Amino acid sequence: MKTIFESNRILFNEVSLELIDDYLKMVNDHEKVNKYFCFNREYFTKDDETTWVQTAIKEKKLVFSMVDKQTKSFIGNIELMHPEKKEAELGIAITGSMQDLGFGTEAITTLLEYGFTKLGFTRIYLRTHPQNARAIHVYQKCGFTEYNRTSDTVFMEKYAN
C-alpha cells in the first residue's frame, strides 16, 4: 500500500484490495458504524467492496485507508467526495475497535489541511445522522458548523481560513 500523506499517528494510504476483509468488517458493523451511514444499506458483500476499491483506484478517487503508524492496524477510511468547484464532501468511517481513541479528530484535521492546502478546496462539507452525537461533536471540534438539518440528516461545513 502506498502512503499518500501522514499525521502524527496515522498513515493515509491508497485503498487496497489487501484490506477488503477489514473494509467488510467495518461497513457491516451495524452497532458502531453502518447505522450512521446517510444511506440505507443492510449488508455489503466481498464483491461490493472489491468493486468499490477497483473503482476508487481506476477513477483516482480521493479516498484513503487509515492505518495506525505504530501497530499497523486498520483504522478506517476517509474520503473527499464530489470534488468540484473548489468544494468536496467529507466522508469518514472508523472501524468499531478504533473508535474513541482520538483518530477521528486527527484524521479530519489532517484531511482538512490536505484538502485546503494541497488540493486548493475552499469549502468542505459533510452529512451525518442526527443521532451520531459523537461524530457531530468531533466535527464541531474540527471547526465544522451546522448549516441545515432535516429529520434524518445534519449538514455541516467548513471554509478554508
What are these regions, as identified by a protein language model?
Residues 122-125, 129-133, 142-161:
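C-terminal "cap" of GNAT-fold acetyltransferases
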Residues 19, 98, 102, 143, ...:
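Conserved functional loop/turn residues at catalytic and ligand-binding sites
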Residues 22, 48-52, 106, 110, ...:
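Alpha-helical elements of Rossmann-like donor-binding domains used by nucleotide-donor carbohydrate transfer enzymes
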Residues 1-50:
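A short, well-structured alpha-helix characteristic of acyl/acetyltransferase catalytic modules
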Residues 94, 100-115, 136-141:
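Conserved acetyl-CoA-binding loop-helix of GNAT-fold acetyltransferases
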Residues 39-91, 95-97, 150:
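Acetyl-CoA-dependent GNAT
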Residues 18, 44, 85, 133-134:
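Short alpha-helical
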Residues 72, 102, 132:
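Conserved G/P- and acidic residue-centered "switch" motifs that form tight phosphate/ATP-binding loops
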